[in-house]
Amino acid sequence: MVKGIQVAIDGPASAGKSTVAKLVAKRFGYIYCDTGAMYRSVTLAALERGIDLSQDDLVSELANQITITFAPGDPQKVFIDGHEVTQAIRSTEVAQHVSTVAAIPAVRSRMVELQRQIAQEGGIVMDGRDIGTTVLPDAPVKIFMVASAHERARRRFLDNQERGIDGGSIEELQRAIELRDQKDSTRAVSPLVKAADAYQLDTTHLTIEQVVDQIAGRIEKTLKQK
């Protein structure tokens, strides 16, 4: 039996990373680790406690105090200190502030530490902004997913509709996504960049199934070489 490998999937906001990562994990019987949900959880906890997000030390202290856990489900369930926050972390307010929290060095180092612990055994699919560059730099399969800002806004809009969330129009979502891209790619700590050895996959005109098949093909090829 070939031991499972680490699969790193990176890319900008709303590129479809989580959806694809979950399906890839399911296909191979791997664990799925939603790193974005971890940063969203810290953001939600800070907002609920009325912590000023510009106070790096207070937010970092909180990140070290709370326990973030996952449980199987569709969608995968997320808990902060035992309380389910699966829907709450997807709110527009959390989405607007998560880049600020994720840019705090001490928060990132704490999350990276937790993510590496989860990934130690292999057989894991992890998606985020800096998995292939910072969290799992030695992952044998690295994918960098991209799509046009308009297509990502359209997908987010449909996703919001499905969840019954009023997250604004496609145009408003596109502006928010472009702002998020700029924040993510220019931050000082672990900016959003493609790892030198990552495969860039433009999903603008691909179906979810086509994206999953392409990534699965790369995993199978890597497993054969082991």
Swiss-Prot record:
GO-annotated cellular components: cytosol
Gene Ontology BP term (one): nucleobase-containing small molecule interconversion
Gene3D superfamilies given in the database record: P-loop containing nucleotide triphosphate hydrolases
Record field: catalytic activity: CMP + ATP = CDP + ADP; dCMP + ATP = dCDP + ADP
Pfam families: Cytidylate_kin
E.C. number: 2.7.4.25
Matching InterPro entries: Cytidylate_kin (IPR003136), Cytidylate_kinase_dom (IPR011994), P-loop_NTPase (IPR027417)
Enzyme kind, highest EC tier: transferase
Record localization: Cytoplasm
Residues that, per the record, bind ATP: 11-19
A GO molecular-function descriptor: ATP binding
Keywords: ATP-binding, Cytoplasm, Kinase, Nucleotide-binding, Transferase
Signal peptide: none
NCBIfam families reported for this sequence: cmk
Stated family: Belongs to the cytidylate kinase family. Type 1 subfamily.
PANTHER family for this protein: CYTIDYLATE KINASE (PTHR21299:SF2), CYTIDYLATE KINASE/PANTOATE-BETA-ALANINE LIGASE (PTHR21299)
Protein name: Cytidylate kinase
Species, as recorded: Limosilactobacillus fermentum (strain NBRC 3956 / LMG 18251) (Lactobacillus fermentum)
